[in-house]
Amino acid sequence: MKKQSSLRGRVTVFLPLFFALVLILPGLENGSYARWMLALSFPCVLLLLLLLPSRLFFLDRPSFSAVAVLCGFGMMAGVYLSEDAALSLALSYALLLLFLFAGAVSARSFRASPFSAVFPAALGLFLLSGPFWTGVSFSLAEGGIALLLFSVSAFLSRRNYVPALGVTLAGLLLLLLGKDIPSALLWGIAAVLLFWAGSGSGLWSLLSLVTVCALFAGAMLLFPSSEPSPSVPSLPSPASMPLLAPEVPQSSPSSGSDPLWLLLGRQYGSVFLLLSLLLMLVLLIRGASLALNARSAFHGILGLGVVLFFGGRTLLFLLSLSGLLPLASPEPPLILSSLPSLAAHGFLAGLLSGISARNEADLAEDARLSMLAR
């Protein structure tokens, strides 16, 4: 316990100091007071959240630290944006924190019930229908997928396999009709694996696999020449990134059209970018541990769904970056500037914290009942 407390104290001191240095120095070099203040705000907020008791916001320290570091890497790239783009990015990450708290409270408070299954399904399908709305130029697909993960987990834990499969296929159909092939691929694979882990039945696992593959095959036959949705960005070539950090970093601010991961690679090197993505392994391992230790089937399946989402998105990004997957893949998790995507990622990361809090509450209840039995 003493070693764990000492390690927590070192992390609490090291992370804010590290990001204070790497964020404030570029702001001073560019001579921008606004960018300097934005760079200073992130370490201060991070220090405050690390010092507050974790039970206050149901925060899980390991997963929150991994999320905070990945967000910090996004801010490191955001320092080189224009002032307006940097301000927009800072507000997006602030909104991510709010959705992270919302996800933690949701996973801590909700159990598998008809409400926790039907309401997220309806709202998620509504968000996935965004490409059919008039005047909407951004994608809400990841927010819809996050809600469908919540809904399908509730259905599977209640052994309502038919509604779970119906919600899965409805979401997949909307993604395919919206021509968001990478998101459809991510959701299809995650849903099939959830059925395999949550149903405990080979028949339902096989049925989900067959129906998902049939939908993909039907979409390819009906839309053989369709292009991905304009809301899904194509990946720039990694050839513009140096292997290591350049001796003279670029000081001119970007207009904001380049993705954050590309700016991060240009300023600090592709090796640093790949090492930063390795931090996603910490989040995935912690999420898998929380899912395996969950006392309820709902929280176990939900934790597995979050791990599949973040792991699948990272894998799609790496495959597309290396040219092995001929698709316009999404950007890596948390290191991006899209406000709807950051909100969805914050909500999903918060679910892991809520599952951790739920596990601790269940263990405390078991200990109390054990004491009463004596």
Protein language model regions, located:
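Interfacial loop-to-transmembrane-helix boundary motif in multi-pass membrane proteins
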Residues: 59-67, 84-92, 102-126, 161-166, ...
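A juxtamembrane structural motif centered on a specific transmembrane helix
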Residues: 1-5, 20-26, 317-374
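Central hydrophobic cores of alpha-helical transmembrane segments in multi-pass inner-membrane proteins
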Residues: 22, 39-52, 69-77, 92-106, ...
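Hydrophobic alpha-helical transmembrane segments
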Residues: 41-45, 91-98, 265-287
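Hydrophobic alpha-helical segments of polytopic membrane proteins
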Residues: 155-222
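Hydrophobic, glycine- and aromatic-enriched re-entrant/interface helices and adjoining loop segments
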Residues: 135, 192, 196-197, 202-277, ...
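Interfacial transmembrane-helix termini
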Residues: 2-7, 21-40, 55-66, 73-95, ...
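Loop-to-helix entry and N-terminal half of a specific, functionally important transmembrane alpha helix
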Residues: 291-329, 335
